[in-house]
Amino acid sequence: MIGYHCLSANGQVKLHADTLQCHIVSFSAGLLFPGTGTHSQGLSGGNMRDLYGTPYLDFALEWSYKQQNGWLAGLDADIWIGMNGDNLTNRVERMGSVFYPGETSMAVNGEDGVVTAYNRALALRPGVGKIIRLLPKNPNSGLLLKLSGGWFMQKTIFHQDFNHPQVYQLSGDYAKLYDHLRNGVMLTESVGFLFMSNYSTYANFKITFDFSQCWSWSSRPWQIDNIMGLNGKDRGRYFDLMYGIRLTWMFPFTGKTTYDYYYY
């Protein structure tokens, strides 16, 4: 709780702000940029930066608990999606049996199907952080350092326009041959600024720069990708670097602000 103690009998006012110990629920939005990546067997064209156009949109829901000494512990749940909505790269070269020049698809009766292909990823990461106080009159704000890590999953989503003929090669289980489904673990280091208002429950935010290392592997028994030379089990391991920036709106559960008045 933030307390304000006012002594006003002789016209003097004294303000005192306390450090908070509270639960915080947060919502964030940001951008992710994949960096260089590697494949353990030397295959090229399969890392995140190669597969999908950038940047990605990153939306997250976060719960955290803040101690009075500035330490935080919490859990982040993220979803990433392609910013442009149709960002699978080189689809004709990757999936020559499905797409042909013009990036249209062969559907039933030889007609053209309309398919949107984009990436989607989910992540769940517990983490710990520390607020380093910078503002003398606000001990709950300052430089934020955070380390988190956990599980993530990414795949290609094929969305078909149902006003056009359907492409059976990308329907149901057949789509799994091309979707690059991968599971893995990731580690994220974050640095930024966190602000918690002395006056409002709603004027609380943080802006952070995130640096992530991702290790993943294919979760499908069979994958087809002509650029990677895949027509079978992908037995390799992937390593990707990710860079991001995000803005977070925080809602601390602190109760009502109290005012104490003394008359003498």
Regions of interest found by a model, annotated:
Residues T36-Y52, G82-A121, Q154-G184, S218-N226, ...:
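Extracellular/periplasm-exposed beta-strand and loop segments of Gram-negative cell-envelope proteins
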Residues V25-F33, W63, L75-I81, L145-M153, ...:
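Transmembrane beta-barrel strands of outer-membrane/channel proteins
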Residues D58-A60, A121, R125-G127, T188-S190, ...:
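Membrane-embedded beta-strand positions in outer-membrane beta-barrel channels/transporters
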Residues D18-F27, N69-L75, L122, P139-L145, ...:
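Outer-envelope beta-barrel architecture signal
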Residues M1-A9:
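Hydrophobic h-region of N-terminal signal peptides that target proteins for export
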Residues A9-Q68, L72, T248-P252, Y264:
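Short glycine/proline- and aromatic-enriched beta-strand/turn motifs that initiate or cap beta-hairpins
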Residues K66-G70, W80, R133-L135, M196-Y202, ...:
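Outer-membrane beta-barrel channels and translocator barrels
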Residues E189-Y264:
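Predominantly the C-terminal beta-signal and adjacent terminal strand-loop region
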